[in-house]
Amino acid sequence: DYVTAIDVEKRTVKLKNGKTLPYDKLVLSPGIDLQLDKIEGLAAANASGQILQAWKAGPETVGLRKQLEAMPDGGTYILNVPLAPYRCPPGPYERASMVANYFKQYKPKSKVLLLDANADVTSKGKLFKGVWESEYKGILEYRPNMKVTGVDGATKTVRFEFEEPIKGDVLNILPDQRAGKLAVDSGIANLNNRWAEVNYMTFESTVAPNVHVIGDSVQGAPLMPKSGHMA
């Protein structure tokens, strides 16, 4: 069973089976949700399977692999990096590097286009840039300050705030993220309705006494990225 709702005033949690349990202390790890509606056209394109995110492991992970395998040699794979903070800071750069490695071996005419909404690589920048230069030059192209604002799943087109639209063959679009639904619905995601603010000495919510929030749903502190070793 699992929790479907939290009442921080009554100090109860509701389960999927309909039962309600009281708590004295609640430790909550609600994870993240993807804000598909923040990019025009993405929700529909994702629902149809035309544009995958594969940021939550599951069917989309397998689906993205199949799309890459089916892509003709000479095609372009477009991956974006959302504005920080987001789950697993090095993740998009790792994924781009892995796909570039696959292309180098099996589709050498293909290209990885990595579009970053941030001004620079957000994690391990020197390491990634060094590998891209030494191992994937001509295969992986990195462009900073490229915030995706819209997509067209049918034409495989990506749109931006200022730059001209770009077309690709496989689009892997990652929207902005926020704390999981439980945190939002219960009011615990109190920072811009996105992240949970906590006391970093105890991880107790600043708006819900006796509720301790851990993991990616917490607003990041300096030197505390949204990554596994911190969660």
Protein language model annotation of sequence segments:
Residues 61, 92-96, 129, 228-231:
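Amphipathic alpha-helical segments in well-structured domains
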Residues 1-94, 101-105, 172:
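FAD-binding core/adjacent interface of flavoenzyme oxidoreductases
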Residues 1-6, 10-13, 21, 100-194:
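A Rossmann-like FAD-binding core segment of flavoenzymes
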Residues 21, 78-80, 87-88, 95, ...:
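Residues forming the flavin
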Residues 76, 109-113, 210:
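Residues at the starts of beta-strands that form the adenosine-phosphate
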Residues 43-71, 166-231:
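FAD-site-proximal beta/loop scaffold in flavoenzymes
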